[in-house]
Amino acid sequence: MWKVIIRRILLMIPQLFILSILVFFFAKLMPGDPFSGLIGPHTDPHEVEALRRAAGLYDPWWEQYLRWLGNAIHGNLGMSYNLKEPVMTVIGHRAINTFWMSLLSVILTYLFAIPMSIVAARNEGKWQDQLWLTYNSITFGIPPYVFYLLIIFIFGYSLNWFPTGGTVSPDAMGIIPVFFSKIYHMILPAFSLAVFGTVGIFTYFRSGILDEQTQDYVRTARAKGVKEKVIFRRHILRNASLPIASNFGFVITGLLGGAIFAETIFGYPGLGQLFITSISGRDYSMITALILLNGFLGLLGALLSDIIMAMVDPRIRIQ
Amino acid sequence: CGSNQSSSTSTKKLKAGNFDVAYQNPDKAIKGGNLKVAYQSDSPMKAQWLSGLSNDATFATMSGPGGGQDGLFFTDSGFKFIKGGAADVALDKESKTATITLRKDLKWSDGSEVTAKDYEFTYETIANPAYGSDRWTDSLANIVGLSDYHAGKAKTISGITFPDGENGKVIKVQFKEMKPGMTQSGNGYFLETVAPYQYLKDVAPKDLASSPKTTTKPLVTGPFKPENVVAGESIKYVPNPYYWGKKPKLNSITYEVVSTAKSVAALSSSKYDFINGMVSSQYKQVKNLKGYKVLGQQAMAISLMYYNLGHYDAKNSINVQDRKTPLQDQNVRQAIGYARNVAEVANKFSNGLSTPANSLIPPIFKQFTSSSVKGYEKQDLDKANKLLDEDGWKLNKSTGYREKDGKELSLVYAAHVGDANAETIAQNYIQQWKKIGVKVSLYNGKLMEFNSWVDHMTTPPGANDWDITDGSWSLASEPSQQDLFSASAPYNFGHFNDSEITKDLNDIDSAKSENPTYRKAAFVKYQEDMNKKAYVVPTNFSLSYTPVNKRVVGMTLDYGAMDTWSEIGVSSAKLATK
């Protein structure tokens, strides 16, 4: 298995290499550049020109690419044009915000989705099932940002229970107040992501349970007189969780993916929001780094999922 | 410019359009109180307390309570320097110098003295490429020795000297030539801020922009100092014990970034005392909010219509007016201007926040403009038709469009994406132009994406595939328009080059214009000539507005208010809801 894992990791190198070329090329096709925003009667156009020249934006794209690649190999992804800080520093700060909020939201998502699926599957066709099916159809059908706005409006503005933006209150000073303020600030976005993000798990898990319930081994167990509760817990649930487990690698790497809509609407400065502002500001170095990060996470997620599957399902072996 | 703000009794009755500029709260301020304010933006603020390295408009406003990135000078509401600020400036025509004298009691927020070197250091951060600033402009080259320093040919700036030493309070700036605009804040010929040299001198230039000393743990000179800066999000201010001026009334100010989608809801649940930077499309939702009073002010901005008349010769840095187009006839340009119904459009779509512009200088610069200047504010189809008739453009009854020498009067309108009404407004103008027999079609049949439009307009030598476009500029507090319309201005999208306009522009910046009466007359002549020649046609002036909670005392948007952050208070501990 280790051989396979190492081979898969080595394979990522050419994949990321191709991705980086594509990103670099397409980013340059966007109209405008990082310095377009500086244009105004207060700025000297010759100076803007000089900045563009100094940044090498007039060189052919492949030349710019090779320069970037040379630096990237040495672990230097460049400076952000707009934020004037090293790309890695900015991503590092934002990644911490995104990671904790995503972690909280993933935990909450499972806490909501799993009981929901069990209740629905065990009461197939009854009102409980109908209720959760309808709920998930609605949350799947309506764009989530509509719900996010609604949640902010109700819990943030009308009831005043939670803060409505940011990661921490400016009044919080010292380690412990800052810690609690950070948790308090991520509850609302994480909760919203979780409550309206159950549909994936719900669909897989519910149908998984339904499928397993009709399997031969369940019938055998019943015939042997095993208690219904035990059958459900020991046999059905275990097997029905396989489709979810197969996705788990992506869930782990997705913690750093960044929630574009939620972060933008909640004003939560994470990687998702950074991605959007980088694109609109034509911050090439940042865009390239973020897409590569996401590409890497995607590949890593697939690998992790395979490893997890091999661990939970004895029939599967990585070869 | 980065000056503090304030109110004087004479400015309290100021009006902008139908708005009050200052809020006259009948209630009295309580002792202390915590003010909660926000700036509307969909991207995080980028805290950078050195003006030379900062380029974030959101933060520029949010740094106000701390002294606005350490502005030195007070100005009147027309942005002219006045005495009484953290420093005074005296200009001397004979010796071609500006003498800047810092207050004796001017201190940084850690109690250390602000020195002459601190003033000079801002020039270093801008002119020394090692700091990576994007604020260098050619106007600064008018200071003796500064371009040599910028180019790395000199280690020090020879034109900036300290009569009583680096640690003294006096700085002498030697210019190559004096300019009449030097009496105005924002003139760009000399800088108006200080930076704490002693505090920063050990930070390597390339690390300065990201150092905590310039981002989260800065020194400031304003009435408040930042106690906590949350990167991207918010700043908490407390009074600065070393502030030289009026002691603030408030105990603290929290200044946050609020996203566009949330700001109206935040106001309706009384989250903020006021929000800066709201846009005109939100005004309808804001104007009747309970617990708030909406203040307004003239925006330092102008929108206008351009005609494409030539190209930009980048090699010689000059506009060449050589394009073959019917727009070379003054009559045609004027007719297209008169055919627009700008007043109706402003009425219908701007919620009272735009007014038709009579000239290229907004009325906030009342010392440089006159309401007697007549432009294209009123639609006049008869006049437009007459102008085209005179010019020999005959109406072809079968097509409905005018022709001359067998060629139809047909133009391409490079309108760009803007707010939700942009397309409707562009189509409306096309219909108006049809009424005078001018055929206008959109560039590629649709609105241009904004970044593509900027590229298309600003990349030399300029494109030949459009005839009309719209632009808008925010203006500096020194209103000379050399940068926009001189023969060498690359942002002169239409590339007109007219000796009379060049003369007008130079006259505004000439030695004679050091006399204010002369300068005003020169400005008025320039505006009249621009309207007559119609190389560009002014469209709108606009108003900005700020909703203010009714508990706030002492709030004003007057540009000449210099102590606002000290004067501002609250009448109760909780925000007003009625």
Curated annotation (Swiss-Prot), chain A:
UniProt subcellular location: Cell membrane
Cystine connections: none
SUPFAM superfamilies: MetI-like
Transmembrane segments: 9-29, 99-119, 137-157, 183-203, 248-268, 289-309
Stored Gene3D superfamilies: MetI-like
GO BP terms: peptide transport; protein transport; transmembrane transport
PROSITE patterns in alphabetical order: ABC_TM1
Protein topology in the membrane: Multi-pass membrane protein
Domain ABC transmembrane type-1 per the UniProt entry, residue ranges: 95-305
Pfam families xref list: BPD_transp_1 (PF00528), BPD_transp_1_N (PF19300)
Source domain of life: Bacteria
GO CC entries: plasma membrane
Function: Part of the ABC transporter complex OppABCDF involved in the uptake of oligopeptides. Probably responsible for the translocation of the substrate across the membrane. Essential for uptake of peptides larger than three amino acids and for growth in milk.
Family according to the record: Belongs to the binding-protein-dependent transport system permease family. OppBC subfamily.
Self-association state and partner proteins as the record states: The complex is composed of two ATP-binding proteins (OppD and OppF), two transmembrane proteins (OppB and OppC) and a solute-binding protein (OppA).
The protein's name: Oligopeptide transport system permease protein OppB
Organism: Lactococcus lactis subsp. lactis (strain IL1403)
